[in-house]
């Protein structure tokens, strides 16, 4: 599979890079690399919509002229895999978790460690939302629990759930190559409780869950929220992330209509994670 690489130069990188990540994700871009002042974004060749990209960039320039320039390049598969891996740096979630790639040579770490073959999948831990939801997971009881991970990406949340004691984890990912990446990461970590499934909302099924993790984006979360609620056991926990802090009220209101009680909001650099309990 070939990918397009979009390279955008931002003149206020610190304040705008995460915002552009969210907007580009809404038009199909899947993976991102930050090299200030440049943001690199990647999308499968078959999914690229030039008109949608031009409209987005033009609209953003009218709202806030922070784009100094951009360049689009079609990359062959063997090139983007090597490029992505070369950019991947270890991720630390406090002193509790370290996320590394197989090629990293690091000093011993006292916390939990996950080995992730980065490739192009979303969810290596670099993005604020993945970092936030990993941090929040350490506050929950996973022992013996059944877990659903929607939009699993690399499978990092599923793998962490197993390390935290979950008995069964269903990792659903709509992109075929990401679902394959989950299988690779399951093998790298010796995981035995994670089931990787290529599919979308239709793959949720009817079996009940104790915990649901969904790190996607606001629009997808709103469209799938009722499906999550339908398979949550009484007192089950739902963690939502992948959206701006300013979007949280819309998700909280929608969840309340489904009997999901808002318990907690955590923020990190304008991104949020929401915790709900099934009443």
Regions found by a protein language model. Give the residues of each.
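Conserved SAM/SAH cofactor-binding pocket of Class I
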Residues: 120, 124-205
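Surface-exposed loop/turn positions
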Residues: 95-97, 145, 236
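Conserved beta-strand segments that form the floor/walls of ligand-binding pockets within enzyme
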Residues: 98, 113-117, 132, 149, ...
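S-adenosylmethionine
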Residues: 174-279
């Amino acid at each position: 599979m070939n990918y397009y690489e979009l390279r955008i130069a931002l003149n206020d990188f610190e304040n705008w890079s995460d915002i552009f990540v969210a907007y580009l994700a809404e038009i199909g871009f899947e993976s991102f690399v930050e090299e200030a002042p440049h943001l690199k974004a990647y999308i499968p060749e078959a999914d690229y919509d030039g008109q949608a990209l031009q409209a987005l960039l033009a609209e953003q320039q009218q709202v806030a002229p922070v784009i100094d320039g951009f360049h689009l390049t079609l990359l062959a598969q063997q090139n983007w895999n090597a490029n992505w891996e070369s950019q991947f740096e270890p991720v630390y979630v406090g002193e509790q978790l370290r996320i590394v790639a197989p090629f990293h040579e690091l000093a011993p770490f006292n916390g939990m460690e996950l080995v992730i073959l980065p490739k192009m999948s979303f969810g290596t831990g670099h993005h604020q939302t993945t970092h936030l939801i990993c941090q929040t997971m350490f506050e929950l009881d996973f022992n013996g629990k059944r877990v659903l991970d929607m939009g699993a990406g690399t499978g990092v949340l599923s793998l962490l759930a197993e390390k935290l004691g979950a008995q069964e984890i269903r990792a659903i990912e709509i992109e075929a190559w990401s679902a394959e990446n989950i299988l690779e990461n399951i093998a790298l970590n010796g995981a035995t409780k994670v089931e990787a499934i290529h599919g979308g909302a239709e793959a949720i099924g009817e079996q009940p869950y104790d915990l649901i993790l969904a790190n996607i984006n606001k629009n997808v979360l709103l469209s799938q929220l009722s499906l999550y609620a339908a398979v949550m056991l009484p007192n089950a926990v739902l963690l939502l992330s992948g959206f701006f802090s300013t979007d949280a009220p819309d998700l909280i209101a929608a969840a309340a209509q489904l009997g999901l009680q808002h318990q907690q909001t955590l923020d990190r650099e304008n991104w949020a994670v929401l915790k709900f309990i099934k009443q």
